[in-house]
Amino acid sequence: VGRPTAEDSGKSHAHTRRAVLAGGALLGAGALLGATPAGAAGKVVAERRLDDRLVELTVDSPALGGRSTVALLTPRGWDGRRPGDRWPVLYLLAGGDGDHTTWTTLFKVQELAELRDVLVVMPGMPLFGFWTDWWNHGKGGAPRVRTYFLREVVPLMERDYGAGPNRAAAGESQGGFGALGLAARVAGLFGAAAAFGAPVHPVRHPEMWLSGAKFVGVDGYAIFGDPWKQWKTWLDWDPYHHAAGLRHTPVYLASGDGKPGPLDGDEPDPHIPGTEKWVALADHGVTSVTEAVCGEETRMLGDRLASLGAPVDVHIYPGGHSGTYGYRELRHALPMLMAALRR
């Protein structure tokens, strides 16, 4: 893939603004969420109580063309809620595997005392869904993962489950891409956003994400399209190119540098065919090219936000893409996220 190069990072602000306008980024949260929470397009078809705080919902999702799972970590008083009772909401977006349970099994969010008075919403998504409305080779249609979140998950939470208007978001890997992209493109949606080991500038390394999709059996060209032919689509979804939309949103960015860290095992990441270019360019000692690329993209977005005067905190550390560092990084980001929820 030849067209996406480092030059994309030097595009003018005017070019970025055109891409933002083309993507509808200047619409406010109310417009993109639908007129009212009562207009939620999805339907909860099952509820399952997992423990005294954890509830799992099965959602029939027109946007996804099937069913999805959303887990809730409920706050104090939630079981006895009355109409009109509302809590601040932390949305935690799943990574590329789409597995919402990572937040309770790996990140251990249920152990955080700071979240006892917060409704934590953990939606799943399709494998390698990228929190994106897929291009689908020009046909559109399901999975429309962004639409699922904006027009189904959030309205359902606000209509039936006590979610209030004070929202923050965090995500690991592709979930971080989703949290930042949504925060940048939908004004007023989140008061703060955090991303851990995330592809936050994927147009910089398109072959990495196309190859990663193929590696897990997903047609990567169905997501954003071909980076030559659908270059504008790639730009429209890229958080870096919507950085101006984050100028007034506190952001926490964290990523490993791809070199072994204290929480990594001895084995390198499996080789992903198609990533040879980035393997060859990787620094000596890198064992996770995926995380090294995420680290580079994180630095680039952090620098861009800093140049705009945005409130951003960047943490780059030795480590790979296993997700084991998310436990620590979520706790680093939590004061910023909680400050937004208390406003």
Language model features by range: what are they?
Residues 1-15, 26-31:
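N-terminal secretory signal peptides
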Residues 2-3, 19-28, 39-343:
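Non-catalytic cap/lid and distal C-terminal segments of serine-dependent acyl enzymes
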Residues 35-37:
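N-terminal signal peptide c-region/cleavage motif recognized by signal peptidases
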